């Protein structure tokens, strides 16, 4: 599901709320989550999961075109850990 599809589905389900208001709310929520992570803070949504930053240590990689070794710097990457309820709901398909 894309962001546009999410906005469309929410606007359809909440027909009393104008689609533009739904779109603005979704965009604002995602922007707030991104800025919270950028500040190094953790986000926890009970029953859904948590978002945090994990550190990737420096390592030696390879250029896929040439095969040459490339030194990659350490960096922080976003990480999502699903909550138990989400794992249980997703497991009905497994």
Swiss-Prot record:
**Listed SUPFAM superfamilies:** IHF-like DNA-binding proteins (SSF47729)
Q: Which GO terms describe its molecular function?
A: DNA binding; structural constituent of chromatin
Q: How does it assemble?
A: Heterodimer of an alpha and a beta chain.
Q: Which purpose does this protein serve, as stated in its record?
A: This protein is one of the two subunits of integration host factor, a specific DNA-binding protein that functions in genetic recombination as well as in transcriptional and translational control.
Q: Name one Pfam family in it.
A: Bac_DNA_binding
Q: Which GO terms describe its cellular component?
A: chromosome; cytosol
What PROSITE patterns does the database record attribute to this sequence?
A: HISTONE_LIKE
List the source organism: Escherichia fergusonii (strain ATCC 35469 / DSM 13698 / CCUG 18766 / IAM 14443 / JCM 21226 / LMG 7866 / NBRC 102419 / NCTC 12128 / CDC 0568-73)
Which superkingdom, per the lineage?
Bacteria
UniProt keyword annotations, A-Z:
DNA recombination, DNA-binding, Transcription, Transcription regulation, Translation regulation
Task: Report what the protein is called.
Answer: Integration host factor subunit beta
By its UniProt entry, which InterPro entries does this protein fall under?
Hist_DNA-bd, Histone-like_DNA-bd_CS, IHF-like_DNA-bd_dom_sf, IHF_beta
Question: Could you tell me which Gene3D superfamilies the record lists for this protein?
Answer: IHF-like DNA-binding proteins
Disulfide bridge map = none
Locate the transmembrane regions by residue number: none
A Gene Ontology biological process noted in the UniProt record is: DNA recombination
Q: Which family does it belong to?
A: Belongs to the bacterial histone-like protein family.
């Amino acid at each position: 599901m894309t962001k546009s599809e999410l906005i469309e589905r929410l606007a359809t389900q909440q027909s009393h709320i104008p689609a533009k208001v739904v779109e603005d709310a979704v965009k604002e929520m995602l922007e707030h989550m991104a800025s919270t992570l950028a500040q190094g803070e953790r986000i926890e949504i009970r029953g859904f999961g948590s978002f945090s930053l994990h550190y990737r240590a420096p390592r030696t990689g390879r250029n896929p075109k040439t095969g040459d070794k490339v030194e990659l710097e350490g960096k922080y990457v976003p990480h999502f850990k699903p909550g138990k309820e989400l794992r249980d709901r997703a497991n009905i398909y497994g």
